[in-house]
């Protein structure tokens, strides 16, 4: 493609399309038909497909014409032209271009069979169609039409408007049809799917107009699809819709799996809970005196009585009657009521398990977790608390697992799509550069010749070599990305090959992608201009070195960092002056070494425009432009790169950070950088460089090149030249010398880091001031706040004006932050002037945006804003699609259900008024759709089903749910996660340059240190001591600091004359003018000392110590710290040498028994207190030492640990008994008291033993020991308090609640949990960081909430009737208070408990909104609010909904998903540190995990022998056939179907039919069981599934006869049959199409160990919190979410409540009663059986309890689930993409068993051909296969047998080809084999199949020759008979005894001795390396 485009197309490309052109096309078509040879066979290979011509992607219809074609010649706009794309040379097409150069392609056949391309009418139609105004008109029409669709009651004249719209659409379609043709050829009207939409819309419009089709509103909804037309008009949207459709396709497997799982769970639910939810408390006994007898005429009507609502018990304040159950742990009825089935199900009868369909809906609701707490509570109340287990299963498997799988799939689809577009962009850029080169070449050649003579010609081969060598392009992110799938990778590789082939013609043998990556940005660094290093190098080395900063250190010269340009390393020999090679000696030059690791070459700088406040002043900043031009460069640099001033990127601690070779610099002079006044410019290389390296200008660069560079710059400027002129005149103020002087002074002040610090402090204070607003406020306080606001506004305004003076408006507004500041300041000033205008108080909220200024100096906030910015950019199109979807569904809902809501409103509301959630008008309809997208669909759907019928509502809501929620929101998440990658995270942290804030902090520290020193010195001087000694350390400190950073490894530093020598032997001196490097001999070699990192020395100017980061200094004393900083040094992706840790650092492990106890005290203690020093050789000391050793042995003993664990579990269990009934159970209470003491003593003893054994140092430096210590201390204190009788003290009571932490001690003992906790602790810093950022983010919304709603949530309420007063009766607080005076008990002026009266309360309210729990009440209160202290009015302030919508999108959506992003990202980083191991698993679990992953992990098993008995044998054959299995599976499925048919209300007849069908199934399964037992004999019980089947059959038979008894005491036996569905898993292997589902299940299996650990941790957290809840909230008043079953009174109830909140469901209900204060509760309420008084909660404790639990469980644990599933899913997908999967190996072994019935693991050679043919694809070698098998050269052992692994390996090799992977696979298989067969003697192979064949052939040849010889001798006749014998004999002998000395052929077998095998492997490796080297050299 590129090759084709390289020739500049020029104006002759534009040829008008004439009849001759058409004739030419026809001629070409005829020619190509003649040329085409007939196909040899039907098979086509992928390569052929690839080599076929494809349409050029740049010249697709709808794209802009590439600029290389230049401008369209006059008169050819909107005129048919010949096609540009060679692909269409043999197709009848032509193209037309409009003014915007957009390309339209048409079919050249006659449209509608009449209008040829040259017809006038058709040409006019084409002109209209391609005109931009035409599409604008259509777009406006669609938008206007959409507006009209939103009218719920359209006016009469709207009918005419409708006709107008239809007319316009018809005209549009006619134009398209005339221009394009209707449907016959390509590019006609109906060939574009988007036109189908138009066509159907128009047809529906006409049909509905002329034919009466009944329900018009349903058909009117069709018009809504017009909104979709916007997608076809806006280009970006089509791609997003493409991505959506792709992800839906990918979701098919997950959908199937989800439906299957839900069906299984629904069946279980059906069996368990059928009819239970109708249990109600009915008045009992019946009172017959009432009117039921109806005047004695009619008898008592039981049906009517049972269904009469007035007879049910309803809890006051609730709408639904109370449910109950008849089991002991279900809900009980109050006195006078009996529990029985009556009335309908809850929620209009829609929540039930009575039929399969309702059960399925209930389960779907559980999976999406919508209002599931309600279902959970109802079911537990009706069936019993034990059924919590069912919900745990469904939530963890269904909800967490399946929903996250959907996320994983969408994320993968998105990632792949992204990858493809990225590659395309890169390809485009490479082509663009190549074209530019071509265009410039002509102008250049003359000068090039002249230059070449003067500078020494550069030979062509050098250029070629350089093209090769410089090609270290960084790995594309697809290679790095885990989520890109196999097929995509293969496609990409093919594309790459093709691309390279095509481009090599245009380039001088250098891969253009590499050239692009490595050449300078303008593409104009001509090769002819490259000169040898020394020519330019000398000139610039001085300057460069002074500017070379230490990568990764804060020394980066800050003043110029922002204007640095994307400079690129030149590939190959001709490097930039001052680059690393300047210092490399000739032998070890960087490039020569870099051969082996291509990806470690230098790559372009990241275009991160983090400029400091100097940037504006330092000249026109160009960073932004470069990033615009080459967006892809941004991504090219991964996070561990650091940038020096030259723009050379070195990858610290990543690939290629250690450049090969000793880096020995020449002696070069350093120029000290003097600290310039900020006004003067510090000139750096970066500034000298404009686009190309302009340093060339100084030496050689010719004027021509210069002009070219400028030309390119010109072409890439945003604005017209006149704008720059204007800017220069008016926006850059340099009018007068005095003015300039003033500017410099102001600049000095404003740019000072201290001013930045002051401003930051002001921002924080201002935020605090705004956060202090509350309701009610005193006037004085309000006044203080107002004054504060004025002061801050003044400060910020002053800052802005001063900056404007210092920087000039032009430069001021170059920087994003300044624009932001200006915007906020203007708003603040505007707000001051409009302060008194009513309704503009919202403007105050804009002040809050100042908080974002903190981002300047807070990297995480900065990152968050960037991420949101990036995503919003990328999400723009997605958001539009989402908006269109929401709009369409809102209109559909309004059109379909609007009327029904109005007409049937009484069904859903007793007052017959429209409820808050309805679809009668567009706004409310929109709100419902938005609510569904938030995941709350079930409640609104019930309403809809009640008023508008079930079918339609279900369809519409399910569509919104699936399309909107699952797909779009998941795409959002995927986008967020992808923009949230390590790059963004690390880039902000170590961006190399420090912000002003850090500098000012360092200055302050420096000042404090200086003051201290002076004081110290002063004191010293007065005490007559030598001053000099004391001052010296400061210099030393400075030098150490500098060196520590320079060395970057924090090694020890010694003073060495003038030089400092670090632990690695490199030295760097500071302050000396000429530098030398002293390098020890043993450090010389890079190999000996892989730690050697050489940094270029730096001159230390005055300013540099400001940049010193104090943390870096600490690394001297902390080698660990420095290791962390070099975070993943060992990841040697690119480097040839891994960095080994220093030897000393690795402690030699000794066997644990012999370790002596550590020292008791720290060295400091021992020095200060001599008594701590003990001689352990004699006397008391010796006894003490013996005691310690004894204690050590005890503590280290396994039994001791087990005993302690047992005690911990017992003591934790004991806590669970301390519920509200403990005082009634005297014995238990006494036992617990004694047990508590015992436990305390045991734990104290344990602690004393550990102190003695380990010593204080070891004990108190271990975090887990601290935990133990604190918990024991709490127990001890409460024990002492009890003994002293202080147990009732408040403080002691609260201490006792801390005993709930006891189970935490189990953490350190259970490895599974400890692993997870360690991983979590590792993540805490980043989680905290994000939590803080979220809090800041929410602060803005909270303050805004306070501004909008403070004091407006109060209302006047009648406590007795529980009714709010209407606004007509009570208007405000004063009126309510008057009423209260008259009737003080009943009426109250109340506040909503969750409100916005202050920022703290606002946070709580926002948390409820963000978790969508309790958010309705908050929103209703907001929407009804009027003014502070006024009675609310229904929907008076309806647009306040929008505040919540915005908060949900930004506050909830972005920030909560950010948590997921951070956690996933963090664990991925931790995994990298642990070498890719899973950090959530213990060692044992890792083994299991690896076993799951390893291929070929099976070994041949001994099959069940076939019985000798004839009949048994026949049955055996029948039972072991696959068909038999499949039939049984089908029977199981049929049985399931019959179970689905069951309903709760079925008739007697139906019941009988089902009974008999069930009986038939039981007989079938019994027969299967009997047959199998008969055939398999005792082997039947060796298979797990058979045992399970046997148990199920027995239970079913027993169940048939004893059904009633079993049902009563156990679960129904039918339930076990549901479990048999698991057997379906066995069929999946047989279905080829089920590969995707197998992958998903495989992913689940792989996730299990890690998920189990997290589950364990979650259980522990729940346990601790439930104990805590019991001790704090046991006596809380029953209301809202707390009642007789769901409460904190007992341990079981607490666990039930906490499990519910794990998904954050219903936590608002549980919190509300705890927030009660009198008079809502009573402090004196008695509790019978307990001494406790009162039923009030403790609000602060309650809020802390719930919020912390939600953050821990919901955000952390649940998100860890997501992280693990995403991870394992990507691994599983990679594995399933392999050509050979686990299943292929399994089938191999299954077939093997038939050929090797005794499981000898060998097969005879003669059977090999049959075996190979019997295998399944891909391992199968179909017959005739003899020759192929012989060629495989398989080793054989005596007896002509071949080992299974050798065969498997050879066949695998045949599938995978010979590759490195194969060696790994082979090794794995051999390991497994040796591990599973330790007893096997190593069989020595004696020959191979190939050798055998060679022997046979040679034997035949020899025999023939010998025969001929004998014949010639005349012996032949006599010896015929004996010859035959001999022949047989020799043959047999040969078989039996091949001489051992025979040199064996070259084969490699499992059965070979180990040593020889290793040697061979080593040789093979050397051979391969040699080959690769040869290949590389041949390329050069």
Swiss-Prot record:
Catalytic activities: Na(+)(in) = Na(+)(out)
Compartment(s): Cell membrane; Cell projection, Axon
GO MF, one example: voltage-gated sodium channel activity
Result of changing residue 1331 to V: In DEE13; uncertain significance
PTM annotation: May be ubiquitinated by NEDD4L; which would promote its endocytosis. Phosphorylation at Ser-1497 by PKC in a highly conserved cytoplasmic loop slows inactivation of the sodium channel and reduces peak sodium currents.
Family note: Belongs to the sodium channel (TC 1.A.1.10) family. Nav1.6/SCN8A subfamily.
Protein name: Sodium channel protein type 8 subunit alpha
Organism: Homo sapiens
Lineage: Eukaryota, Metazoa, Chordata, Craniata, Vertebrata
Gene: SCN8A
